[in-house]
């Protein structure tokens, strides 16, 4: 349910969101569809300003919402604090990744990803674990 943000313009993001909608059409997604924004080595979005990055997240979420799905933004705490204008995305669901025993995040959130090394019976590799 996460779409990585590897493109930089609002137009590209809307196109990407439309592609996601074609893939999820007909499915019930109670948690929604999330826009994944984070620093990626060599990623085009790394060069964007916080305002541009936020505008892309809003464009994605509004496109998803327009199709009747819940929309949200996924990232880690320092990215939410420093690379986005949180006030402009706070109306969407927030999925925060912070690998600690206790979450330290100043804003309202919906889902907390607390580890990337969880274990689940029947799955041999580590998995992300979330509370929401």
Name these PLM-found stretches.
Residues 14-21, 80-89:
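Distinct, well-ordered alpha-helical segments
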Residues 1-8, 12-13:
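Single conserved hydrophobic/aromatic residue that forms the stacking wall/gate
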Residues 64, 68-82:
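Aromatic-lined carbohydrate-recognition surfaces of secreted/lumenal glycan-active proteins
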Residues 87-132:
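Functionally critical loop-and-helix segments that line ligand-binding/catalytic clefts
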């Amino acid at each position: 349910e996460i779409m990585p943000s590897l493109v930089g313009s609002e137009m590209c993001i809307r196109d990407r969101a439309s592609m996601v909608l074609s893939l999820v059409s007909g499915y019930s997604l109670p948690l929604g569809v999330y826009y994944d924004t984070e620093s990626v080595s060599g990623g085009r979005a790394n060069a964007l300003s916080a305002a541009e990055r936020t505008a892309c997240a809003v464009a994605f979420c509004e496109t998803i919402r327009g199709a009747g799905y819940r929309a949200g933004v996924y990232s880690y705490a320092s990215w939410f604090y420093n690379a986005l204008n949180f006030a402009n995305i706070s109306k969407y669901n927030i999925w925060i990744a912070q690998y600690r025993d206790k979450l330290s995040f100043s804003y309202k959130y919906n889902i907390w990803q607390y580890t990337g090394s969880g274990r689940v019976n029947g799955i041999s590799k580590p998995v992300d674990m979330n509370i929401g």
